[in-house]
C-alpha cells in the first residue's frame, strides 16, 4: 500500500567532477588561527559589570548583536570566545542528528582571497578547526560538515551551479566525500547522502530561471559515491532538518516529484534512504517519529516511521491531522471548522477551541474550558487545568511557551482588545492578570502588549511595553500576579526560540541604557556589552 521500492541504479557511480583546487582551499587542523576581527581578549581585559558564574556549564551560546545583521558574540560557558564586527556573520552549529552544539561557524572579509571572503569552523575552545578561502553556509549532520555557497539561489537548481558549490567533509577523519557535479544542496540521511542536482537533461535552459524544478534531480549515494537512487524532476528535504527536531528520524527524506515542465508537484512522498521504503501521500511530520499521510481514498493516517522493518499505520481519520503527542491527536474538521482532540487509547473526543505547538509540547484549550499541555515526545500531561470561557467569547489566542507553561488570551470583541489574560503552568499555576490595574498603572502609554519572557521558581514572567518620556518605548518585567519585577528596560524578551543550549531559568535578553545582554530577575547582568560594540566594521569604523 502506497509503497514503492527504492530505485536501484544499475550502473557505476555517477562520474564526479571535483576541481583540483577544492582540497587546496580547505584544510583541517593544524591551522593558523583566523584573523580575529574583534579579539575576545579586549573584552576580557575590560572592566566587567556582569557576573557570568551561572553560565559555567561548558555550553556554547550566542548573543545576537543589538540592531545589526552581524556583530554577534559567541560564548562557551562564562568565557567569551569571539566578538564579531558588523561585517562578520557567525552562528552556532547544532548537529541535526545528535542534537549536540559543539562548534560555531564564522564568515568574514579577507581581501587576500579570490572571493574577498573567508570562513572558518571553530570548536568550544575557540580553536579554528577548518579554514576556507571562499564564502560558505554550513550545516552539521552526524559529524559531517555540509557546505553550500551562500548565493541567492543556493537551494535552487539555477543554471550557474558548478563543482565546489556543495562540499561534504567528515570532521572525524578530515576526508572530503565525493559530491555529484552541479549539486546545489545536500542532506545526510542515515549513513547515506542525498543531493539536489542541477540536471537539465534534454530540457532547453530557461534563462529567466522560471520553472526551475524541471532542471532538478534527487540523487542518493553512499559515502564512497556509489549511487543508489535517482529521481529526475524532484527536490529533497530532510525530515529532521526541516522540522528542527533532533528526535525526528534521520533516515527519512521528503521527496517532491515535479511535472516534466517543473510547474507543479505531482507527488510528495517520504523515502527511507536506508531501507528503500517509499510512502506517498505525505502531508506533514508531527512528532515522536509519527507523520501524517493522506491515503488514496482521502482519509488521513497517523504513520509511525520508527516501527521495525517498515512504517506502520497507527490509525485513520476523516479529517486532516494538525498535531500529535503519544496517546492523542488533534484533527481539524473540514466541514464545520474547529479542532477535535482524540484520545487514541479510549476513543474519547473533545471539542477544541484553540491549539498551540511549542518546541516539544502541544497545548490545547477545549470549548468546555479544559486547558492541557502534552509532552510531544512522551505524551505526558504537563499541565491540566480549567480556564472558564468568558461571557460573549469571540476568539482566543493560545501561546505555548514550553516547559508546560501556556498563556491564554480571550476576547469578547472583534477589534483585538484583550479581555482576559491567563497564565497556566505545570505546578498548578492558573492566574488571570488584572488588565484594568495594568492599564491604570501605565495610562495612555500602554497599548495592551504583553509578551512571555521566562519562567523560574514556579513563576512566569511577562514584559509590558509602553511609551515613556519622549515617546520612547520602555519595557517592564511583571510576574503572573501583575507585580512589577523590573522597570524601565530598553528591551525585554525571552532567549531565542528553538535555540540550542538555553539560558539558565530566570535569565532573559534585555537592554538597559547602553548595555545589552543577558539579565536575571534581580536586574543583574549575567553577561552584557555596550550596544555600540557590534556596530564597527573590520577596520573599526563605527556606524550609528
Give the label of every model feature segment.
Residues 35, 39-544:
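Residue-level detector of conserved, function-critical positions
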Residues 14, 18-22:
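Hydrophobic core
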Residues 22-42:
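Sec-dependent signal peptide cleavage junction
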Residues 2-13:
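Bacterial N-terminal signal peptides that target proteins for export
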Amino acid at each position: 500500500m502506497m509503497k514503492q521500492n527504492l530505485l536501484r541504479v544499475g550502473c557505476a557511480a555517477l562520474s564526479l567532477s571535483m576541481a583540483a583546487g577544492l582540497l587546496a582551499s580547505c584544510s583541517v587542523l593544524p591551522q593558523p588561527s583566523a584573523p580575529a576581527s574583534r579579539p575576545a581578549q579586549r573584552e576580557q581585559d575590560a572592566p566587567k559589570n556582569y557576573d557570568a558564574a551561572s553560565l559555567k556549564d561548558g555550553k556554547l551560546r550566542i548573543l545576537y548583536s543589538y540592531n545589526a545583521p552581524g556583530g554577534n558574540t559567541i560564548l562557551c560557558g562564562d568565557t567569551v570566545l569571539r566578538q564579531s564586527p558588523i561585517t562578520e556573520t557567525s552562528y552556532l552549529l547544532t548537529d541535526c542528528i545528535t542534537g549536540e552544539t559543539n562548534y560555531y561557524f564564522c564568515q568574514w572579509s579577507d581581501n587576500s582571497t579570490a572571493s574577498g571572503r573567508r570562513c572558518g569552523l571553530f570548536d568550544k575552545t575557540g580553536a579554528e578547526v577548518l579554514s576556507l578561502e571562499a564564502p560558505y553556509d554550513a550545516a552539521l549532520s552526524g559529524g559531517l560538515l555540509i557546505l553550500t555557497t551562500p548565493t541567492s539561489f543556493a537551494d535552487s537548481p539555477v543554471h550557474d551551479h558548478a563543482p565546489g558549490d556543495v562540499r561534504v567533509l567528515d570532521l572525524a577523519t578530515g576526508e572530503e566525500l565525493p559530491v555529484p557535479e552541479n549539486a546545489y544542496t545536500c542532506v545526510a540521511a542515515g549513513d547515506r547522502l542525498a543531493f539536489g542536482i542541477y540536471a537539465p537533461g534534454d530540457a532547453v535552459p530557461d534563462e529567466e530561471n522560471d520553472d526551475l524544478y524541471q532542471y532538478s534531480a534527487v540523487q542518493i549515494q553512499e559515502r564512497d559515491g556509489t549511487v543508489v537512487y535517482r529521481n529526475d524532476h524532484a527536490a529533497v528535504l530532510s525530515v529532521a532538518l526541516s522540522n528542527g527536531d533532533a528526535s525526528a528520524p534521520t533516515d527519512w527524506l521528503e521527496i517532491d516529484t515535479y511535472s516534466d515542465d517543473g510547474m507543479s508537484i505531482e507527488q510528495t512522498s517520504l523515502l527511507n534512504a536506508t531501507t528503500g521504503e517509499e510512502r506517498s501521500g505525505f502531508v506533514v511530520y508531527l512528532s515522536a517519529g509519527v507523520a501524517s499521510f493522506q491515503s488514496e481514498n482521502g482519509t488521513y493516517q497517523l504513520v509511525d516511521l520508527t516501527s521495525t522493518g517498515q512504517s506502520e499505520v497507527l490509525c485513520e481519520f476523516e479529517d486532516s491531522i494538525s498535531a500529535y503527542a503519544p496517546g492523542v491527536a488533534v484533527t481539524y474538521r473540514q466541514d464545520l471548522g474547529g479542532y477535535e482532540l482524540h484520545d487514541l487509547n479510549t476513543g474519547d473526543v473533545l471539542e477544541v477551541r484553540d491549539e498551540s505547538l511549542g518546541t516539544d509540547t502541544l497545548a490545547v484549550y477545549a470549548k468546555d474550558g479544559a486547558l492541557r499541555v502534552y509532552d510531544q515526545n512522551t505524551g505526558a500531561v504537563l499541565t491540566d487545568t480549567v480556564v472558564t470561557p468568558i461571557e460573549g467569547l469571540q476568539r482566543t489566542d493560545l501561546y505555548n511557551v514550553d516547559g508546560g507553561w501556556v498563556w491564554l488570551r480571550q476576547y469578547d470583541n472583534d477589534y483585538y482588545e484583550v479581555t482576559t489574560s491567563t497564565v497556566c503552568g505545570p505546578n498548578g499555576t492558573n492566574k488571570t492578570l488584572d488588565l484594568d490595574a495594568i492599564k491604570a498603572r501605565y495610562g495612555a502609554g500602554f497599548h495592551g502588549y504583553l509578551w512571555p519572557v521566562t519562567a523560574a521558581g514556579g513563576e512566569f514572567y511577562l514584559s509590558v511595553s509602553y511609551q515613556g518620556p519622549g515617546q520612547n518605548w520602555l519595557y517592564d518585567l511583571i510576574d503572573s500576579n501583575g507585580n512589577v519585577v523590573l522597570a524601565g528596560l530598553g528591551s525585554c524578551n525571552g532567549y531565542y526560540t528553538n535555540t540550542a543550549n538555553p539560558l539558565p531559568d530566570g535569565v532573559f535578553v534585555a537592554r538597559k541604557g547602553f548595555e545589552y545582554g543577558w539579565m536575571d530577575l534581580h536586574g543583574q547582568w549575567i553577561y552584557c556589552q555596550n550596544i555600540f560594540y557590534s556596530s564597527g566594521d573590520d577596520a573599526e569604523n563605527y556606524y550609528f
